[in-house]
Amino acid sequence: MAKTILAARKHIKKQVVDGIAHIHASFNNTIVTITDRQGNTLGWATAGNSGFRGSRKSTPFAAQVAAERCAEAVKDYGIKNLEVMVKGPGPGRESTVRALNAAGFRITNITDVTPIPHNGCRPPKKRRV
């Protein structure tokens, strides 16, 4: 009986020059997603899956580590320029942008896309600590 040899097909990653970094910085976590211009996800990382748990997720250092891991995940695509979209009021807003810049990306512009309600839903009650 003849054996069929299955050739493992190597997945060739397309080369993308320009990308968009979507940063969602909430009070509890930071999510970094890098997409191409059409919005197709190339890689992502969060403070939670970078090894931080509990209140350590909501630190600027955790956001920095998440940005570095996301940059490492998409380096095979050959991205040179990044447009940064920041959403949310969290502590990881600034450190994430600094980490992406330090990872070797040229940041073309930074846009704040935080949704601001025109008097929509009622906000959560104030905390009493």
Swiss-Prot record:
Biological process terms in GO annotation: translation
Is Glycoprotein tagged as a keyword? no
Does the record carry Ribonucleoprotein as a key word? Answer: yes
User: Which SUPFAM superfamilies does the entry link to?
Assistant: Translational machinery components (SSF53137)
Q: Which UniProt keywords apply?
A: Ribonucleoprotein, Ribosomal protein, RNA-binding, rRNA-binding
Q: Which Pfam families match?
A: Ribosomal_S11
Q: Name one GO molecular function term.
A: structural constituent of ribosome
Entry's transmembrane regions: none
List, alphabetically, the InterPro entries matched: Ribosomal_uS11 (IPR001971), Ribosomal_uS11_bac-type (IPR019981), Ribosomal_uS11_CS (IPR018102), Ribosomal_uS11_sf (IPR036967)
Q: Which PROSITE patterns match?
A: RIBOSOMAL_S11
Q: Which GO terms describe its cellular component?
A: ribonucleoprotein complex; ribosome
- What subunit structure does UniProt give? Part of the 30S ribosomal subunit. Interacts with proteins S7 and S18. Binds to IF-3.
Q: Which family does it belong to?
A: Belongs to the universal ribosomal protein uS11 family.
- Record function comment: Located on the platform of the 30S subunit, it bridges several disparate RNA helices of the 16S rRNA. Forms part of the Shine-Dalgarno cleft in the 70S ribosome.
In Swiss-Prot or TrEMBL terms, this protein is called Small ribosomal subunit protein uS11
